[in-house]
Amino acid sequence: MDSSCRTPPSNSWVYPTVILCLFGFFSMFRPSEAFLIPFLSEPSKNLTSPEMTNEILPVWTYSYLATLPPVFVLTDYLRYKPVIMLHVVAFATSYLFLLFGQGVMLMQTAEFFFGVVSATEIAYFAYIYSMVSPEHYQKVSSYCRSITLVAYTAGSVLAQLLVSLTNLPYSSLFYISLACVSVAFFFSLFLPMPKKSMFFHAKSDRDDCPKPLEQCTVPKEAQSNRTHSELFANSKNLEDREMSNPDPENSALRHFAHWFQDLKECYSSKHLVYWSLWWAFATAGYNQILNYVQVLWEHKAPSQDSSIYNGAVEAIATFGGALASFSVGYLKVNWDLLGELGLAVFSAVIAGSLFLMNYSRSIWVCYAGYLLVKSSYSFLITIAVFQIAVNLSLERYALVFGIDTFIALVIQTIMTMIVVDQRGLQLPVTTQFLVYGSYFAVIAGVFLMRSIYILCSAKCRKEVQNLATTRSPNEPHPQEPSNVSTKF
C-alpha cells in the first residue's frame, strides 16, 4: 500500500500547529490597533475627522472586496504558505506607510494594504486543514483561533498600560506592532509547504491512494451524513469526469464547474439560506461598526483633551466575545425551532446598543454599547457558523463561507458608498451609527417575523399530530386540503 495513505504518526500535526500558532500570536499581537484614530488625529499627521471618515477608512472596504476573490482562488492554488507570507508583508507595508507617510493619499495606501491583510487572513485558518488529518481538526481549530484572541487581548492590554501609565506616544505602539509582524514573518518561513490543498491539489491525493474516498479526503462531518456506498459512487463519478477530460487547460474550468454545482446543492436548503443571509447582512453591518467606532469615540471624547481607554475596551470586548462564543457549546437549544428568534432578539440588542451609542454624550456609555455589540455578534456568528457547517463537508463549508463573506463585502461596499464616501451622502459619524442601528433593527424585524412563522407552523403541526393520535381508529380521517403545506 502506498505510504501516502497510511495513518500519519500521532505527533505529525504538532509541528505545523505550533509554528502556525506562533505565527498567529505575533501577527495578531497589535497594540496599535486600538489607537489608530487617535494616532491619525495627532498634530504630526494633521488629519481631520471628515478626512479619516469619508476619504481614508472607506478604502479598506473597497480593497478588501477587490482582493478577496483572487485571493480566495490563489490561496488554494498556491497551497496557503505563500499567501500567509503575503499576509504579514502587507501588514508590514501598511505600518510603514502609517508611520512615515503624510497626507490623505498615503494613508489611503496604508488602508489599501490593510484590505489585502484582511483578504489574505483566510490562508491562516485554511492552512492547518491541509497539514493534519481530520481527527485533529477540532483540536487544531481551537488552538489556532484561541491564540489569535489571546494575542489581540494581550496587545490591547499592553497598549492601554503603556498609554495610561507611561504616556508612551501612539507611534511607539505601531513600532511594536511592526516588530511583532516581522517576527511573524520569520516564523512563516518555517511552515511546511502543504502537498495538497482543499480544491486544486486534492486530485493528487486520490491518485496516490487506492482506498475509497472517505478514507483519504472526505472529512468526518461529511462521512456522518453519507453512506459508504454514496461516497464511493461519488468518488468514482468524479474520477470518471476527470479521466474524460484530461486536458490540463480545462482543469480550472472543471474546478469552477464543480464549485458551482456544490454551491447550488448547498443553497437548495432553505435553512442554510436564511442563516447565510443573516451572516452576510450582519457581518456587513458589524464590519462597518468596527471600522468607524474609534472615530465615534474620538468625537465623544477627543484624545487630545481627555484620557482614553480604547485598549482596555477592546481587550474586554474581545474577552467577552470569546466567552459568548464559548457558551454556545453548552446551550441545549433546538436551534431549528428557536434559532431565528435568537437572531431577532440579539440583533435587536445590537440595534439598541447602537442607538444608545449615537444619542449618549458619555464615552462610557459608548464603551458599554460597544461591549454589547461585540458580545452579541460573537454569540450569534458562532451559532450561524455551526448551523451552516453542521451538514457540510469541509470543502463545501469553505465555499459557502467564501460566498457569504463576499456577499457581506458587497453589502458593506454599497453601504460605504452611500453612507460614508465623499461621493455619497458623506454623513457625519454620529448619523452613521444611527443608520447602522436602523439597519440592525430591520434585520431584527425580518427575523422576528420569520421566527413567528416558524413557531406558529410548529404549533399547528403539533396540534394536527395530537388530533391524529387521539382520534378513534374506526373514525374516518378527513382529507387534508391539498393547498395547505406545513413545511417551512
Swiss-Prot record:
Changing V88G: Can mediate pyridoxine transport. Residues 1-8, 76-82, 133-145, 194-276, 332-335, 391-399, 450-488 are cytoplasmic. It is a multi-pass membrane protein. The chain crosses the membrane at residues 9-29, 55-75, 83-103, 112-132, 146-166, 173-193, 277-297, 311-331, 336-356, 370-390, 400-420, 429-449. InterPro entries: Folate_carrier, MFS_trans_sf, ThTr-2. It is found in: Membrane. Pfam families: Folate_carrier. Changing Y95W: Can mediate pyridoxine transport. Residues 469-488 are annotated as: Disordered. This is Thiamine transporter 2. It comes from Mus musculus (Mouse).
